[in-house]
């Protein structure tokens, strides 16, 4: 048992033992009082210990016993875990407005981010509606993405050039770091028309610090926090989560603020030439009357985009390469398709994607087998409601266990096997309408950056597979292809994939 749990329990035991004992008895009955069934609860802590280090896997195992709508008591907090497409549809679509309020972890309520971030505002708020409209119409619409296609093509060329340098030197490439650099530079070029990181430089200096900030935020925002289970402990910050997130989030906010300030000064110059980037687009909007957009809102929105865009797509591409190296027959099929369609062309263009069905099937299977967000960002019930005949009290924390849904043998044939072929003759897509595959969420709170992430995932996988064969770094072959992951907002590979590119 971790030290913070021991200390926290010692602090609160005298206060709550008696009052919680009655809940222990009721919790053993499973589903009594109209609540969804769930595992027995211990006094005081409820089901906290059953989360374990990998909550997505622990909760999936519990759901096999207690069903696709399962209740838990996490300290003072009542929670419900959804583990089926039918229940996910009910929560995200049919009763989407009731469950559209995000659950904001205690540690993230820092620097005003929870009052401004689109990810943390209730969907019923005017600010959320405004920011969502900006993202949908100005940043991720088809015309906006078409206008920035050249930026993505250039980043794919840079990724190819870096892999070629590794090939010429006969050295292994850290696939996760290389794709992280690609996505980071893509995001900063798209947002600010600048490049932030260099390939192979994430072990030193500012590149290392930036990666630390992003990785820390995606990890700490997702891990269980005792201050959420017992809110009266939040001011004490027993795990130091608030302190850590204040530092890492503050560092990114300062970086973005400096870039915005530089642009504002440049725009005051009469000779300034507008750039084809999101910052100028949103600054123009902030000067108009249609959106009433503030500089502070732009800053926090960009930080959200950087965190989501840099880490999750890089992690998913790394998992794709792991699976393709584990399955040489699948790699061969993909390379044959790429050769047939692309020929001698080294960089896949987005217009090529529609002619690459096995590539799309491969990406879908990676998103099924390794969903970037194993537990979708939790929602909270804005009012008491009923789901499948069970009462869901107001403020219940709702988890959608995407990882469990994508490993369910009643939904997927051979779910533990990596089989892109399952999607070749299937209409199932990850756009939010097929609830057996919702890695980007669904309904009102579906990830607004999904169109960009989808394009880059397919293009990065195609670029790495079409131009190179791959050999694992000598001496650690068995560890390189292990599927052990690290839980957080994004599911990271525990042991990075390092492989030597060989020019085709």
Swiss-Prot record:
GO BP field: diterpenoid biosynthetic process
Domain of life: Eukaryota
Membrane topology: Single-pass membrane protein
Regions that span the bilayer: 4-24
Keywords on record: Heme, Iron, Membrane, Metal-binding, Monooxygenase, Oxidoreductase, Transmembrane, Transmembrane helix
InterPro entries: Cyt_P450 (IPR001128), Cyt_P450_CS (IPR017972), Cyt_P450_E_grp-I (IPR002401), Cyt_P450_sf (IPR036396)
Swiss-Prot/TrEMBL cofactor(s): heme
GO MF assignments: heme binding; iron ion binding; oxidoreductase activity, acting on paired donors, with incorporation or reduction of molecular oxygen, reduced flavin or flavoprotein as one donor, and incorporation of one atom of oxygen
Expression across tissues: Expressed in glandular trichomes of young leaves.
Pfam family name, one: p450
Known EC number: 1.14.14.61, 1.14.14.-
UniProt-annotated location(s): Membrane
Binding site for heme: 447
A GO CC term attached to the entry: membrane
Pathway recorded for this protein: Secondary metabolite biosynthesis; terpenoid biosynthesis
Catalytic activity: 11-hydroxyferruginol + 3 reduced [NADPH--hemoprotein reductase] + 3 O2 = carnosate + 3 oxidized [NADPH--hemoprotein reductase] + 4 H2O + 4 H(+); miltiradiene + 2 reduced [NADPH--hemoprotein reductase] + 2 O2 = miltiradien-20-al + 2 oxidized [NADPH--hemoprotein reductase] + 3 H2O + 2 H(+); ferruginol + 3 reduced [NADPH--hemoprotein reductase] + 3 O2 = pisiferate + 3 oxidized [NADPH--hemoprotein reductase] + 4 H2O + 4 H(+)
Stated role: Monooxygenase involved in the biosynthesis of carnosate, a potent antioxidant labdane-related diterpene natural products. Catalyzes the oxidation of 11-hydroxyferruginol to produce carnosate. Mediates the conversion of miltiradien into miltiradien-20-al. Also involved in the production of pisiferic acid and derivative products from ferruginol.
Sequence similarity: Belongs to the cytochrome P450 family.
Entry protein name: Carnosic acid synthase
Organism: Rosmarinus officinalis
